[in-house]
Amino acid sequence: MPVQSMSRIISYWAARQADRVAIDHEGRAITWGEFEERTNRLARAYSELGVQPDDFVTIALPNGIEFFEACFAVWKLGATPQPISAKLPKSERDQIIDLGKPSLVVGAETGAFEQIVSVPQGFVPGEHLSAEPLPELTAASLKAMTSGGSTGRPKLIVSAQPAAWDTDLPYLEIPQQGAMLVPGPLYHNGPFVWAMIALFRGCTVAITTRFDAEQTLTTLERLKINIVYMVPTMMRRIWALPEDVRTGYDLSSLQTLWHLAAPCPAWLKECFIEWLGAEVIWELYAGTEGQGTTMIRGDEWLTHKGSVGRPVEACEIKIVGEAGETLPSGEVG
């Protein structure tokens, strides 16, 4: 199937699985058919508020169905979502707003900015707005994430990838029309990317308001999750549960557990490999800027402990010494 604009992906899956759950937030669910209609109406509301193609739209919403609806409504207008934490202090939020100069801020009180339109959490589009599909538009940039970086001041990391995706493209071991759990904050790049690609692939995506170790296991069992995104801190908290609690859930549907974003202690990784199986555990090393990516599966890691894997896609890895010279394999640089 050809690459599809983000403005068309929900329509594509809604036509094929309208009654299947698209997003589950701690038991509250929305189907693909509902997701399509609600984002069409919301996109028209954002358009009435002034959003144009290739604008940035700041999304300051907590984890929830509303977060996804806002992002896809923005994509349906050919604009670019810019997620930020809903809990940012006003001073930090205003710095990011000044940096990105969005045409709309979603999740801020009405009138919060002198020259930028804003709508609060819980904003509902008018009943007069149509739920019919909109014209196809493709934003020049898929996403614009924020980071404090090493300077302590916010910076905007604008993706060079257009807002389009091949829904048949195998990626990150995410099964087409599977079920994925993302228990991390969606304004972070990792959870955002994993959750969105899962939706692009037609998966049911489960999210939680915040991470809770046993709730994660409950959700894995309840929704027969195939793939889950984690960071080592989450893994450590799950391992700290009483053994009878940790092993008391049916996780037989789980095919892939990704961990990334921080170094994982070898002992913890070994525990998860022994518990879930080496071929289930995957590690990824990358950055929001997208300069390159490495991946390694658990069975490969067992023979190369400490490795973060081989480069993938067009990435090349080079280790250099203090003078900038290329070092041979096995040397520390």
Give, region by region, the residue ranges found by the protein language model.
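Conserved AMP-binding/adenylate-forming core of the ANL superfamily
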Residues: 2, 11, 19-64, 68, ...
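Conserved pre-ATP/AMP-binding loop-to-beta segment of ANL
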Residues: 3-4, 19, 123-146, 153, ...
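Conserved AMP-binding A3 loop
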Residues: 31-33, 135, 139-166
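Structural core segment of the AMP-binding/adenylate-forming
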Residues: 44, 48-49, 69-72, 76-137
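A short helix-loop-beta submotif of the ANL/AMP-binding
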Residues: 56, 62-82, 86-90, 100-101, ...
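Gly/Ser/Thr-rich phosphate-binding loop
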Residues: 145, 200, 226-229, 243-304, ...
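Conserved AMP-binding/adenylation subdomain of ANL enzymes
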Residues: 165-179, 187-227, 241
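AMP-binding/adenylate-forming core of the ANL superfamily
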Residues: 318, 329-333
